[in-house]
Amino acid sequence: CSSKTRYAYTFWDDINVIDKEQIENWQPFGSVYDFFYEINSNNYFVPCNTFRACVENYRFAKINNGRLMTSMGNWKTPYTTSFTAFKSYLNSRLWVNVNYDYADLEKTFFDHYYGDGGVYMKKFFDEMTSYMDYMRDSGNADFNGVVVNEFTYTAKYWPIKMMQRWNNYCDLALKEIEKTKALNDGTYEALHDRILMETLFPRYIICKYHAAKFSETEIASMRKAFYDDT
């Protein structure tokens, strides 16, 4: 598929009619190998809102003689922020069965992947995707899921108070998993790293696009902490 496909939408949506017809026209000739994109290749720190749409796109590929479905992720970057881990989980399930219910997959992931911190991480995720859905549905082309898009990297799209609130959810999630330290079996470390990973997106936005709101000493300290955690 084209890198200009709007992956925040499904192939059933009118905005992707050209790509939809392209796949449909190929399928009579044999097995179709689908290559979709689920990242913003300009900047891995900024989310690409394909979570729900990818489920329908897997189903579309399946009914159009799809034999192999590949979702492009982050090259040689196994641990990435913006809930990329959830995308990997969705792909792993949908590769097996395209009929899985999205809501069930979402619940299973957030109930387990972040341990007791999952409640706050789900809150972060819900606010993030709802905001991006709103921006997309308001007709803002910068949020339509095109894989090559540098236009979402501005302070106006990511207000500092929103970024601080999302980062605070991660802090609250980290507090929730403190009790697992007593297990002394690596559980705490695994959960800690998974939650810390999701702080990178809001912290990156704050450090890069809201730096003027802090003193030179403050922003230098914040950037060093960000660097140390990546």
Task: Please identify what each model-predicted range represents.
Residues N64-N65, L90-T230:
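Catalytic domains of carbohydrate-active enzymes that cleave complex glycans
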Residues R6-K123, E127-S130:
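Structured mid-domain segments that build the active-site/substrate or prosthetic-cofactor binding neighborhood
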Residues S2, R6-Y9, D14, N144, ...:
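Active-site lining segments of carbohydrate-active enzymes
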